[in-house]
């Protein structure tokens, strides 16, 4: 069984026991998160595609950790000006393990 969920402005195809990194959610490690923005649900009996959401479908996940991605370097230089700027950014993410998919 699989589902397509929407969180943080992105869409993810998930199935039970899938571990994925999503944009930061306000939840502690060990907490349970429920996603109601389910765009599609599929399995052996067929696939249901929402317009835009599948009514009554939910995906439950457990928060494993709050983490940060690798550093992205931003380097700006103006030629012949002896002007340069180096900056770094680490995007915060939440690591989830999908527990259950409930198709209504």
Curated annotation (Swiss-Prot):
The keyword Methyltransferase does not apply. GO terms for biological process: translation. InterPro entries: bL21-like, bL21-like_sf, Ribosomal_bL21. Pfam families: Ribosomal_L21p. It comes from the Bacteria. Part of the 50S ribosomal subunit. Contacts protein L20. Belongs to the bacterial ribosomal protein bL21 family. This is Large ribosomal subunit protein bL21.
């Amino acid at each position: 069984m699989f589902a397509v969920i929407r969180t943080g402005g992105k869409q993810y195809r998930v199935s039970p026991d899938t571990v994925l990194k999503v944009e930061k959610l306000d939840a502690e490690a060990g907490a349970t998160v429920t996603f109601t923005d389910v765009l599609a649900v599929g399995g052996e009996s067929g696939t249901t595609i929402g317009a835009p959401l599948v009514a009554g479908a939910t995906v439950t996940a457990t928060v494993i950790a709050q983490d940060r991605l690798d550093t992205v370097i931003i380097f700006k230089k103006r030629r012949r000006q002896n002007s340069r700027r180096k900056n770094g950014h680490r995007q915060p993410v939440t690591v989830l393990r999908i527990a259950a998919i409930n198709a209504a």
